[in-house]
């Protein structure tokens, strides 16, 4: 069972390799975005609840393998495992089509700091317990690269192995443009109120 749409291709490949049936048990609401990108846990939890609907008849009484592209904070995975168990799944096994996310991304993907990354702070057993899953397994870094058919040097693997290919300033973050805009606006307001005198250099 894939978590749509991010797990569709990996779940299909998993089904073909193992000979297990592929079931689209979750129906996705395409008007809800990626939950891990939302600014608060409350919004993430709400998005996860309304994003997918389950077809219970495909799950009841079965041992289920759920496939997704990643586990970042664990919000989506936990909700999906619980959905499947509530629908009557006898067992739920989680398979992830990438290695564990161990490091934040400083190149534009909104991964939180390391303290908020599930795999960076918990053992596989702890993740399994948190998700209420019967097992959790990740694709290896080598396996992920092999699946692409491209050489490893074509990819940034920093979020998995901590090797950042381009230097970055950790003081800069995704809010840097907003901070700059706020400074410019405050200077503009001060000039408008004659609280600040412009000087020509």
Segments predicted by a language model, with ranges:
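PRPP-associated nucleotide enzymes
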Residues: 1-201
């Amino acid at each position: 069972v894939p978590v749509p749409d991010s797990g569709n291709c990996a779940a299909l490949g998993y089904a073909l390799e193992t000979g297990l049936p592929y079931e689209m048990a979750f129906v996705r609401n395409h008007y809800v975005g990626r939950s891990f990108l939302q600014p608060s846990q409350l919004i993430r939890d709400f998005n996860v609840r309304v994003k997918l609907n389950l077809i219970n008849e495909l799950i009841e009484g079965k041992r289920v393998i759920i496939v997704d592209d990643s586990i970042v904070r664990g919000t989506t995975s936990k909700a999906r495992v619980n959905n499947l168990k509530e629908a009557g799944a006898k067992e739920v096994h989680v398979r992830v089509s990438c290695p564990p996310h161990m490091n934040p991304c400083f190149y534009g993907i909104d991964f939180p700091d390391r303290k908020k990354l599930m795999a960076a702070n918990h053992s596989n057993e702890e993740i399994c317990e948190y998700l209420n899953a019967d097992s959790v397994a990740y694709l290896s870094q080598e396996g992920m690269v092999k699946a692409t058919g491209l050489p490893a040097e074509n990819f940034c693997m920093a979020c998995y192995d901590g090797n950042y290919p381009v230097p970055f300033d950790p003081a800069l973050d995704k809010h840097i443009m907003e901070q700059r805009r706020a400074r410019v606006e405050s200077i503009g307001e001060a000039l408008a109120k004659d609280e600040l005198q412009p000087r020509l250099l």
